[in-house]
Amino acid sequence: MKKLLSKVGKIILLAIGIIIIFLIICMLIGFTLHKTYYKSQLESIKPYGEMVNVDNKNMHVYSMGEGENTIVLLPGHGVPLPSADFAPLMRELSKENRVVTVEYFGVGFSDKTDKPRTNENYMNEIRTSLNKAGIKPPYILMPHSISGIYSEYYATKHPEEVKGIILLDSTSTALTSKVFPKDIVSTYKAAKFQQEISLQRLLLSFISDETLEKNGYSINNGYTQKEIDDIKKYMNYSMNNTIIEQLENTFTSVQEVKDLPIPESVPILKIIASENNDKRQEEHLKRLGNNASSVVLDGTHFIYHNQTEKISKLTDQFIDKLN
């Protein structure tokens, strides 16, 4: 009986050893593919706009349309390819305006960076990239989500460069508690590891076109098939240390901005997604002051995916008041 148990134990240990070796081999293969073949697929996609030098690294600036006003779209956290993500909104807004998307370091076609992800650095990178692309202020900033923090900071530091701000379901800078718990940061770090061994690619391969459409990525919402395909490819490369640090610094960024007075010369329109219309928005509007107004649109946090026409009309009305 003892010999039998000993034999069974050895077989189990051998099986476990084989499984571990198999998993290690799979991870090594996945890591190699991620760094070579899959990366070459990504690099085959040409930037939609212009690459400019910022702090000796490349940043992507995508411009469309002409007009008296320049609208600058700034992406939310971790959006894989903002230039494609914002494309339907850009096409709608560019009918009467110059519209620009700035891709931060760590997303889209832009390089990654080790430079601290602070409000000051984001502001300087936005200003420098636009200047290098020959796009001069003043601007109407149109930030989504976390970029609202950087836009408010920008307006307090250089109000002469900011003609107005249209917030797309932006992060509230009136928050007093931590925005993201530590377990979310840990989840991002785990996702980065999954990405590096190509597991993320495997998991994303199960996402159907119907699921993408439900999240707003559809021809009916104004996307081209190329934009949808490019976004899907970039989803496999969306996790990196630059955006993880951005997430980790969110609370610090909010705390730095929340006590800075918004200049009275900068009007603000806050567009709120119906799913996020709660007390946080009221607190935020109080902080923004008397020169701020709000509109609630039906939709999710990525409100610009399916409300491009309404956002465009609200933008026209906002600009009419500026003039």
For every predicted segment, state its role.
Residues G299-E309:
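Catalytic histidine-centered segment of alpha/beta-hydrolase-like enzymes
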Residues P137-F180:
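Conserved hydrolase catalytic core segment
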Residues K2-I71, K95-N97, K136, D320-N323:
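Alpha/beta-hydrolase fold catalytic core
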Residues K57-F109:
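Conserved HGGG/HGGXW glycine-rich cap/lid loop of the alpha/beta-hydrolase fold
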Residues T171-L203:
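A catalytic-pocket lid/entrance helix-loop region that shapes and gates access to the active site
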Residues Y223-R287:
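Conserved serine/cysteine hydrolase catalytic core
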Residues K286-H301:
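Catalytic histidine neighborhood in serine/cysteine hydrolases
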Residues Y104-M142:
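Active-site loop/oxyanion-hole signature of alpha/beta-hydrolase fold enzymes
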